Amino acid sequence: MIKIVLNGCCGKMGKVITECASKFNNLEIVAGIDKFPHETSYPIFETPEDLNLDYDVLLDFSRSDALKGLLSLTEKTKKPLVICSTGFSNEDLALIEEKSRTLPLFRSANMSLGINLINSLLRKVTPLLYGNYDIEIIEKHHNQKVDSPSGTAVLLADTIKDSINEETKFVYGRSGLSKREENEIGIHAIRGGSIVGDHDVIFAGVGEVIELSHKAISREVFAIGALKACEYMGTISNPGLYTMDDVIGITK
């Protein structure tokens, strides 16, 4: 049995993860970490420093500002940390990269199987289409999401950029009077209602448009992905920065 400590256990995703964990025979949430605790089937600690029990994997699905406290705990325990939060700064990402040299860390901007398959497809199709097609990314989320563009949109955009040999640049939204440049990758964010998460990658050519689309129907898809990452990381002891590609066996 893999024992999980869930940071952000009382948030929207934390509640869904707690519910979905009961479907995994080899996983158990033994404790949670949350500043605003409510009654659960497991004990809740307000900060990582307060945690006083043993665990196998630390799962974070909260906010980016929790990162340093979680890394400090991981440095003490040497247990794997699964990072599912988004909205990290470049400094945060550099810190994760640095700590992964000595700690087993996992990070993904999106925990769904579908998004990660699309990301894998982009590595293959982008070099074939770029040059004859303009590339734009549109992401849609609920009106409570604080980071923009979404971590997933950034993930997809980075994959596209890394797949192109030429110099490209990101353009976030469009306004005013200016013609689109050939080397642009457009990224657009929409916030409204209760949209769980929609992502469209558009390759617009002359006479045709190719789209890769993903629509999350419920948060359960992210919860299951996070728990599968815990299954995988529960078997890992070597330092490194692991991703969903490792979990689902995608080779780059």
Swiss-Prot record:
GO terms for cellular component: cytosol. It catalyses: (S)-2,3,4,5-tetrahydrodipicolinate + NAD(+) + H2O = (2S,4S)-4-hydroxy-2,3,4,5-tetrahydrodipicolinate + NADH + H(+); (S)-2,3,4,5-tetrahydrodipicolinate + NADP(+) + H2O = (2S,4S)-4-hydroxy-2,3,4,5-tetrahydrodipicolinate + NADPH + H(+). It comes from the Bacteria. Its main location: cytoplasm. Keywords: Amino-acid biosynthesis, Cytoplasm, Diaminopimelate biosynthesis, Lysine biosynthesis, NAD, NADP, Oxidoreductase. The keyword Zinc-finger does not apply. Pathway: Amino-acid biosynthesis; L-lysine biosynthesis via DAP pathway; (S)-tetrahydrodipicolinate from L-aspartate: step 4/4. NAD(+) binds at G8, C9, C10, G11, K12, M13, C84, S85, T86, S108, A109, N110, M111. Belongs to the DapB family. This is 4-hydroxy-tetrahydrodipicolinate reductase. It comes from Clostridium botulinum (strain Alaska E43 / Type E3). The gene is dapB.
